[in-house]
Curated annotation (Swiss-Prot):
Keywords attached to this entry: Carbohydrate metabolism, Glycoprotein, Glycosidase, Hydrolase, Polysaccharide degradation, Secreted, Signal
Organism of this sequence: Aspergillus terreus (strain NIH 2624 / FGSC A1156)
S-adenosyl-L-methionine found in the keyword field: no
Catalysed reactions listed for this entry: Hydrolysis of terminal non-reducing alpha-L-arabinofuranoside residues in alpha-L-arabinosides
Gene behind this protein: abfA
Signal peptide: 1-25
Name of the protein in question: Probable alpha-L-arabinofuranosidase A
Length: 628
């Protein structure tokens, strides 16, 4: 990610600082007394596998179509090398979950290297760390195998290993190797596996369930890619909602996200057809999500299936007694997550290496059940799941998947939260600045998904509008408990939804921090625990603000949703110095992409005169003043 820069004087963004007694423009006075408690979970993440954000994205495994899974297995991403042919073999299952393999038929007169390549997910990022590769093979073979990472166009080798291996036609043998790499200049790299054709003439070998990992985040087995994980860690979010989203619901009952098919050894995970146009391996499964939360200090928000698929697919919604097995499935999932190792599913979790229960306190029942024909039945379905879960786990906080009162039971059970999703235009986001000012404080809100939408990349106008909306949320963070921008990640080469918070390609160092990413980072990193009263002679618009404190530190967040600069003074009694972080561009259409980085935040140290900070807020800008 791009680090903040420190400037003085005019600087890169033409920031003007002066110490004066008064200014014309927006004058704010922050109270140092009292205030409302602010949710400690306010800023966080929503994740589902969209835009290859999981497979091919933050999930560290790099071989595409690695288990030849799905209802129509094919050779996507695979190609033959030398005197051999490859095909999908459906007759040599590794397990019930991995029924197919890649068959290599070596010609009777073969010479030279014979094998196959895999192109990864639109490339393979070779970062210079040690790589780990494993696969399963079957067939009568004894000899050398060579694994290489090689430039697709250049032929340059970035890592390789040659080793002796034997296998038989009786059963599969698992092969695991490690090898050093040198950093590749781009992601146009192939994984290549070959044998000596002359010594293996006429052989037929089957291979399946390939795994290729570089160094992972926190060195977790089957873990995350560090570059993307580090970008998220830098936001200092407080929660992770998973596994969706539409991908939780599925297109029908069969393709819903099935928690019990995402746990344990990879050879026992069949994967499922995702809702965003591609197959999900589920290598990033329930435990991996929870390790992600643990390693990044995030509170899990576990979504559970609630009897409804997208657009009422697959004879859903399911109601009445027909819901019983699905309620039992959720209770089994929660026992797996929360149960003591003496319980059936707690014991299963322990057998997979996690003895202690996971720290899960928030569970969301369904996803967007107000849409696609789910509303009419949701009150019944929510109540059935709520009662069963609450009876078994009374300390869990349960979240409804909508705030639409016509879809919810009346009254809503005490302690339940509601979820509001908001994809909108910039102007509409700004109009919603005060939408939570007068809501019922007895019903907490989760803003599970929001962003400006329908443009290729986040731009300054949209990001400032999001900041205005977020300021409105933070002002009401006694009742708004959590909020997450969505979607979170995007592989530029395979995209189903834009804009996205963080985009990436497989080229090294190609993590694209958007303007919206910087807004999220600025707001999340600079958080108080108490929202302070701010008085002003000015009305909100085009400048919007919120102030908070934590101990002796104060945070004032501002957004200028307009083309004119604004003179601002902020008075905080007792404060003498601070730091001003500003994200701005005079062009509201300015954006960062895979070909340009136009907008990054700048920081400057500022001094106060008698507790008053004065500065110029640029056009189309978001700013955070931190004072102490």
């Amino acid at each position: 990610m791009v680090a903040f820069s420190t400037i003085s004087g005019l600087g890169a963004l033409s920031l003007l600082f002066s110490i004066i007694e008064s200014v014309d423009g927006v004058s704010l006075k922050v109270s140092t007394d009292g205030g409302n408690s602010s949710s400690p979970l306010l800023y966080g993440f929503m994740f589902e596998d969209i835009n290859h954000s999981g497979d091919g994205g933050i999930y560290g495994q790099m071989i595409q179509n690695n288990g030849l899974q799905g209802s129509s297995p094919n050779l996507t991403a695979w190609a033959s090398v030398g005197d051999g042919t490859i095909s999908v073999d459906t007759t040599n299952p590794l397990t019930a979950a991995i029924p197919n393999s890649l068959k290599l038929d070596i010609k009777p007169d073969a010479t030279g290297a014979v094998g196959f390549t895999n192109e990864g997910y639109w490339g393979i990022p070779v970062d210079g760390t040690e790589f780990q590769n494993s696969f399963w093979m079957k067939g009568d073979f004894s000899g050398e195998i060579t694994v290489r990472l090689v430039g697709n166009e250049t032929g340059t080798e970035y890592g390789s290993t040659t080793f002796n291996q034997s296998s038989s036609s009786d059963d599969y043998t698992k092969v695991s190797v490690k090898f050093p790499t040198t950093k590749a200049p781009d992601g146009n790299v192939l994984y290549e596996l070959t044998v000596d054709g002359e010594s293996a003439q006429g052989s037929s070998l089957s291979f399946t369930l390939f795994e290729l990992f570089a160094q992972t985040y926190k060195s977790r087995s089957n873990g995350l890619k560090p570059q993307l994980a580090d970008a998220l860690e830098s936001v200092k979010g407080s929660f992770l909602r998973f596994p969706g989203g539409n991908n939780l619901e599925g297109n029908d009952v069969e393709t819903r996200w099935k928690w019990n098919e995402t746990i344990g050894p990879l050879e026992n995970r069949p994967g499922h057809q995702g809702t965003w146009g591609y197959f999900n391996t589920d290598g990033l499964g329930l435990d991996e999500y929870l390790y992600w939360c643990e390693d990044m200090n995030l509170t899990p928000v576990l979504g559970v299936w609630a009897g409804f698929a997208l657009e009422s697919g697959g004879n859903t919604p399911i109601t009445g007694d027909a819901l019983t097995p699905y309620i039992e499935d959720v209770l089994n999932e929660l026992e797996y997550v929360l149960g003591d190792p003496s319980t059936t599913y707690g014991k299963l979790r322990a057998s997979y290496g996690r003895e202690e229960p996971w720290n899960v306190t928030l569970v969301e029942i369904g996803n967007e059940d107000n849409l696609g024909g789910g509303c009419e039945s949701y009150a019944e379905r929510f109540t059935a799941f709520y009662n069963a879960i609450h009876d078994a786990y009374p300390d869990l906080t349960l979240i409804a998947s909508t705030d639409n009162a016509s879809c919810l039971p009346s009254p809503l059970p005490e302690g339940a939260w509601v979820d509001y999703h908001n994809y909108n235009t910039p102007d509409e986001l700004v109009k919603q600045f005060g939408m939570f000012d007068n809501v019922d404080r007895s019903v907490p809100y989760f803003i599970g998904e929001y962003s400006r939408w329908e443009i290729p990349w986040p731009n300054m106008q949209g990001s400032v509008a999001e900041a205005v909306f977020m300021i409105g949320l933070e002002r009401n963070s006694d009742v708004v408990k959590m909020a997450a921008y969505a979607p979170l990640l995007q592989l530029v080469n395979s995209t189903q939804w834009t804009p996205d918070l963080i985009s990436f390609t497989q080229n090294p160092n190609m993590v694209i921090d958007s303007t919206s990413y910087y807004v999220q980072q600025m707001f999340s990193v600079n958080r108080g625990d108490t929202i302070k009263e701010v008085t002003s002679d000015s009305a909100f618009g085009p400048v919007y603000w919120v102030a908070s404190s934590s101990g002796s530190s104060y945070y004032v967040k501002l957004a200028n949703y307009g083309a004119d600069t604004q003179e601002v003074s902020v008075s905080i009694p007792g404060m003498s110095s601070g730091k001003l972080t500003v994200l701005a561009d005079s062009d509201p259409e300015a954006y960062n992409s895979d070909t340009q980085t136009l907008v990054t935040p700048s920081e400057s140290n500022v001094q106060a005169s008698n507790g008053q900070f004065s500065f110029t807020l640029p056009a189309w800008s978001v700013a955070v003043l931190t004072a102490n």
